[in-house]
Amino acid sequence: MTKKTDALYAAPLHDIIDFQFDERVVAVFPDMIQRSVPGYGMIIANIGVIAARYAQPGSHCYDLGCSLGAATLAMRQRITAPDCDIIAVDNSPAMIERARELLSLDTGLYIPVTLLCSDLQEVTIENASVVVLNFTLQFIPPPQRLALMQRIYAGLNPGGILILSEKIAFSKPEQQQLHIELHHDFKRANGYSDLEISQKRSALENVMIPETVAVHQKRLQTAGFSCAELWFQCFNFASLVAIK
């Protein structure tokens, strides 16, 4: 499949609507996320590495908010624990349809994957050894986030993990501004114009709410996790691994 270039915000828009994962976004998503999220490829590759270490025989691995299935593919190609499977969930029908197409091209003798088009907050999590939330929690209203962490914790087997990747905020204003500016420089270096950066930011401001690493770690501790280790950060994007 040819990767299409993201030009969704290249022309001036009179009315900027809230960002949503519709067919237009799905068509350019691989290009969009590679050019927008510093270290995305490294995060995806190492989700596979981490999942391979913690996947338990006979358990489920969940990719909640799987989009086109990049993390699912990384886990599928790395996990060797017997009788494991992956349950990949997204609430965008367009994302699930395209993920199904991409997974069908991955013809190796890997562990089975079930794709579900569903609200991840309604999915039963049970007998889990690995749960992935890769840039997903930030789109869930903050008052609902602790309940989701508690559900994930309850569904994990002892020794299981949650991999949580997020755009993050900073408590000090000067630190926050520095990382915003560095991220914008990253996007410019990847070919986005100032107009595209500004319009995309306006589309996201009401639907994506970042939090500090400390807030994430405190919430994970409240949910019951024994530790929540920051294993990756590049500018204002980070990933943690939390262990039950």
UniProtKB/Swiss-Prot annotation:
Its EC number is 2.1.3.-. It catalyses: prephenate + S-adenosyl-L-methionine = carboxy-S-adenosyl-L-methionine + 3-phenylpyruvate + H2O. GO terms for molecular function: carboxyl- or carbamoyltransferase activity; S-adenosyl-L-methionine binding. InterPro entries: CmoA (IPR005271), Methyltransf_25 (IPR041698), SAM-dependent_MTases_sf (IPR029063). GO terms for biological process: tRNA wobble uridine modification. It comes from the Bacteria. Keywords: S-adenosyl-L-methionine, Transferase. Gene3D superfamilies: Vaccinia Virus protein VP39. S-adenosyl-L-methionine binds at residues 40, 65-67, 90-91, 119-120, 134, 201. The keyword Plastid does not apply. The keyword S-adenosyl-L-methionine applies. PANTHER family: CARBOXY-S-ADENOSYL-L-METHIONINE SYNTHASE, TRANS-ACONITATE 2-METHYLTRANSFERASE-RELATED. Belongs to the class I-like SAM-binding methyltransferase superfamily. Cx-SAM synthase family. Catalyzes the conversion of S-adenosyl-L-methionine (SAM) to carboxy-S-adenosyl-L-methionine (Cx-SAM). This is Carboxy-S-adenosyl-L-methionine synthase. It comes from Trichlorobacter lovleyi (strain ATCC BAA-1151 / DSM 17278 / SZ).
